[in-house]
Amino acid sequence: LRHAGVLALSRIGEVAPIVALAKSENRSLRIAAVLVLRRLQSEQLALFLQDQDEYIVTEAARAINDDWSIEPALPALASLLKEEKYTSEPLLRRSINAALRVGGEKELDLLINFAKRESVSSNLRGEALAAIGTWASPSVLDRVDGRYRGEINRDAIVVKHKIEKFIPDFLKDKNPDILVAAAKAISSLKIEGYNAQLAQIMKNHASPDVRSAMLAALGDLNYTKIEEAMKIGMADIDRGVRTVAVGLVTQLDLSKEKLPAIVEPIFKSGSIVEQQKMLSVLGEMPLEKSKDVLISLIKQGNDKKLSNGVILDLTEAVEATKSEELISQLGTLKAHGDGLAAYTETLNGGDRRAGYQYFNTNSAGQCVRCHALGGAGGAVGPALDNIGNILSREQLLEALINPSARLSPGYGMVTVTLKDGQTVTGILEEETEDELILKTSDAEPMEIALSRIDKRQNMASGMPPMGTIMSKREIRDVIEFLANLKKN
């Protein structure tokens, strides 16, 4: 009913009577007014940012920031950062985003003061610091809803001048969220006066996320003692910190004689992620330094002495060198064709988070148009909430590369020719070791013993073979994501 009323009032298009509802004592009318003004894209929504009800203020913030945005009202939304009474995270994230988008000195001051306020939750203070760090060149995508906002370039000198004097206070903070955000801001703004403090925090802080952030910042800031910091990072107990340290190898002026001493321990006892990072680094290094190490790794790969989770990374690193000599040595490591054997290097070693991102957002794969997770998504194909308990990694790969090879019960048509000559077509409801159960035009499902079947034909799946759409790296990431979708 409310939707019908909102739609009708927005089509009538009279703004003044709707704005007048800002003074109404009826909460429902004020909420409806926000919804109508959102449809009308009216900057008068800024009036509702002064409402006494934080829910209504938050709805007004959503209306102003999200979708196409109401840009004239963004300064008013940003100004809410000075109000200490608000606690709603959706509201304050939009206020932070509005300040970043408006981009004036006033908004920058609001962000800095908000980040300093200890009464604010650490994740929101960290978000404010992150916005400050990207002030000179924000992402083209909205920090809240991901919509494309276009390229913005500002003078970094202004933000560096304003934030630099507060850096010592942020680095003294005990909260990991603040320290990580501060390190990233220092790095992106190229503030170089605090390298010694970053190094000290990197050595001593209990949080691996903080140690990783400090080490990464030191690498970006060309720290003079980066080799020492890298060695400390490589000896860290946390895999993530060690992986960051591996990425710093390219910043060292290493001779080819010293390189094996760094690489070999990683492939002897390091994690898959560390090995993948090392291979990425080797692919970027001058060939005269990395050649001998790559030759050794290729041999290990051909001798089955490397984890399958790094074979794709090895082939990519070798191809990045553009050395025909090395590429020719890959042999069977570089699989070709369109069968499953050509994709075996995608079975392990994927990035689960990247797979999640691909599944939910990639416009080429369009996974969520057909498959649901947690009740959200399409119903053309089966829900995948428990797919990791149902299919092996090999079966997941087959489902991506050759989706018609195996039908999911309830989602595919099968035609079988029986040994007595009868032909039956129906939807596959269940398949066991002994029989097929098909839903046909008959009232009851038909149970057909496999021993009676002379020929079976699965109808082509509506899902295209994803090997023609996805890169091998994307396939590997999606397999890692799907293999971990398991219900207890």
PLM ranges: what are they?
Residues 314-321, 401, 422-424, 428-434, ...:
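C-terminal capping alpha-helices of c-type cytochrome domains
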Residues 25-27, 52-55, 84-88, 119-121, ...:
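Short inter-helical turns and helix N-cap capping residues of alpha-solenoid HEAT/ARM repeat scaffolds
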Residues 4-11, 35-39, 63-66, 94-101, ...:
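Core register positions within helices of long alpha-helical scaffolds
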Residues 355-358, 362-374, 384, 463, ...:
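The canonical Cys-X-X-Cys-His
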Residues 2, 30, 57-58, 88-92, ...:
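Residue-level detector of extended alpha-helical repeat arrays and alpha-solenoid scaffolds
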Residues 334-362, 392-395, 419-421:
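Electrostatic cytochrome c docking/interface patches
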Residues 1, 11-23, 40-50, 69-83, ...:
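Amphipathic alpha-helical scaffolding segments comprising HEAT/armadillo-like alpha-solenoid repeats
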Residues 443-462:
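Structured surface patches comprising rigid loops and adjacent beta-strands/short helices at the edges
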